């Protein structure tokens, strides 16, 4: 479906903005006379806005149309990245990143919600996995290009590139809205924003919804709190330059792409519980290996394992998120994203303090222990949920 391909490009742009700053932390710290932990405020601010503005973006998407909302936030995000490129100080860069995160944050959740409206549940997980190919490529290319551009032209260069990318993506989304009836028809009935807010607040009363939201919050805190410092770890402890350390993170996206390419066969073979168990195992091994890696060559398969494991676990959570409230799917998936990026914000803040005092390895080890335990707990709860549904 062409509409999904364009949404995948929007997801690419979203991921590019999300992860492009990671390899630039050493350059930002040097440019603004601060530590890597201090420079990581640009990551935290983006994640905070990305998460907290979901409570607005989701209901608006339900009201005005999810695909149309993705177009508008993509167009506005181009201006946000331009503001980042011209920021004269770290506080203003943090403010510009916060503003950009507020709009970029709506892209993936509303795109997922639109897919939830358009694709039946039994076919949804492979479609979501293919949609996320754009997201994974965005991570891979943004960290690689950002690091290389940063070394050659300075940290501002990547934001000009991102601005151009968002302009192009917005143009393609607008074309789809004008020419593809599916972008206007495949959505739940539009309801008042206030009703969508009330429905979002009421979701937390469901026991299974609370499990999904709590799990994704902890996942975001442990996984992305540690991943934000993977490029810095490669630069500081593995002896790589800024460009090479950014390119190294592409291995993470490579692992995710492997999952996306085999998801159609893997999902029916392993089932949801098998995906969760395998995902937790890959993540634990990946972070433990990264903490102990003696060199970059050893770190590459560790990052690939992280990508494979993360998308096995997270894709399962995403599918359940699209079913939390089918009648108000934009608000429901936005609440899911709110919890994910609230967790990431907390994780990056906690990790930044640990990195400045104890280095990156303790952060990776905590993630290596905590995430497999989280996966085991969710697997157990998933089995109990299936039994509850089976017995009515």
Pin down the residues of each PLM region:
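Helix-to-loop junctions at the C-terminal end of transmembrane segments
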Residues: 53-65, 259-271, 355-356
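Juxtamembrane intracellular "pre-TM" segments in multi-pass secondary transporters
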Residues: 178-212
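Helix-loop-helix hairpin linking two adjacent transmembrane segments in secondary transporters
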Residues: 92, 120-126, 130-177
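Paired small-residue
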Residues: 80, 91-100, 297-305
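Cytoplasmic helix-loop-helix junction between adjacent transmembrane helices
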Residues: 96-134
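C-terminal transmembrane helical hairpin of 12-TM major facilitator-type secondary transporters
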Residues: 273-317
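Conserved MFS/SLC helix-loop-helix module at the cytosolic interface between two early adjacent transmembrane helices
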Residues: 52-88
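Helix-breaking motifs and short loop linkers at transmembrane-helix boundaries and internal kinks
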Residues: 33, 65, 86-92, 103, ...
